[in-house]
Regions:
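Ligand-binding pockets and gating/stacking loops
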Residues: 1-235
Length: 235
């Protein structure tokens, strides 16, 4: 690695203004750093039994959501700025794609509930919640009605569903928004996807109105022209 770094630095001489080249060198350095630091971050053998229990995790388990949560905390401790955890699988008996069957939702929810609660407690106990934002979300909900008689499933439902945020800059222990009595439409305090994104960006210290990309001679906002920060949930 030292030899590669030497050649990269030699190649950069006289080309310091080439941002693409500097970024290329930086990407190689980042990749090398992941290879050297990654194995230690993913090694849970030194975590205590009580911590494993907190996440509902058995030693040696590398597939569960609890494993993802504990690794996520370890990555954040080591300076990783963005971590994504995903629950679900492609197996027909373990995924959230409930078009034909929702009877496994209780089991799916239990498998997520224990680890995510453990993660929040662990972050708080370690003093990490003050500068960590936890966003628990999905791409859409499930409708309140059976679209096909006799089939215990639900279709995609984008009109109303829930997400939650915890951590830095967010009020705790509150609910914002309300559905109608059937869970079919929003009845109060609508939060659009653009509002949700705007609020997350605000909590990350980013002005969503200035975060733009250039296309066809115009500047476009990632939150479009509709996004507004949901100030009611801010601490």
């Amino acid at each position: 690695m030292g030899l590669l770094e030497f050649f990269n630095r030699q190649h950069l001489k006289g080309r310091e203004s080439d941002s693409n080249l500097r970024a290329r060198v930086k990407s190689f350095e980042t990749a090398a750093g992941m290879q050297t630091a990654g194995p230690e971050a993913f090694d849970l053998s030194k975590e205590s039994e009580s911590t494993h229990k907190l996440y509902g995790l058995k030693r040696g388990d590398t597939k569960s959501f609890g494993w993802q949560c504990m690794v996520g905390r370890r990555l954040i401790e080591r300076g990783v700025r963005f971590v994504e955890l995903i629950d679900g699988d492609t197996r027909i008996d373990y995924n959230w794609d409930a078009h034909a069957n929702m009877t496994n939702y209780d089991r799916l929810a239990r498998n997520v509930d224990h680890p995510i609660a453990g993660l929040l407690k662990d972050l708080k106990d370690r003093g990490m919640m003050e500068d960590t934002l936890v966003v628990f979300a999905t791409e859409f909900g499930r409708g309140p009605f059976q679209p096909t008689p006799g089939v215990n499933g639900r279709g995609h439902h984008s009109r109303v569903y829930s997400s939650w945020i915890a951590g830095a800059g967010v009020k705790g222990g509150m609910v914002h928004g309300q559905s109608d009595e059937l869970g079919d439409n929003v009845a109060k305090d609508l939060v659009t996807v653009h509002d949700f994104q705007s609020t997350i960006l605000h909590l990350l210290g980013i002005d969503h109105e200035r975060l733009t990309y250039r296309h066809a001679g115009r500047n476009f906002r990632l939150t479009d022209v509709h996004g507004n920060v949901v100030k009611q949930i801010l601490a």
